[in-house]
Amino acid sequence: MGPAPAAGAEDYDLINAGKQPVTILPGACFFHHADSFAMMRGGHLDYCVLGAFQVSVAGDLANWHTGAPDAIPAVGGAMDLAIGAKQVFVMMEHLTKSGESKIVEQCTYPLTGVACVSRIYTDLAVIDVTAAGLEVVEIIDGLGFDELARLTGVPLRRADQRVAA
């Protein structure tokens, strides 16, 4: 999408997810939401990027409801994306506001998808979800592996510790 439209040039048929008017750049493409769900459900997406409240060591994804009584649950198309995309990448902060890891042994929030996450991008590391467990691909400068493992609280292994097949 392009920049916000000039005052008076808004086209309210062209809005973003926050219902704000947007512009498009040359070559942009968009289509009806029914077509987007057909693409998701038909397995036509190579990958998608989603946010998350929690990701389990098995790659389970919880991203639509924390169970908080004042929160309005909002699945949207996340379940379709989580199951329909060939690879699911998650982008999230590594820790909650209270300092707990969002990467958990088992999700405690309602699941969006089971064993669907391929890779986790956080503010501290890049972690692949593999059949052998969580594999740390990259860590931010200044943070050691042992400290990352302590903060995460679930078993991690370095990418260079792969078991030979």
What function would you assign to each model-found segment?
Residues P5-A165:
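Conserved phosphate- and dinucleotide-binding cores of soluble alpha/beta proteins
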Residues M1-G2:
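Contiguous alpha-helical scaffold segments within structured protein domains
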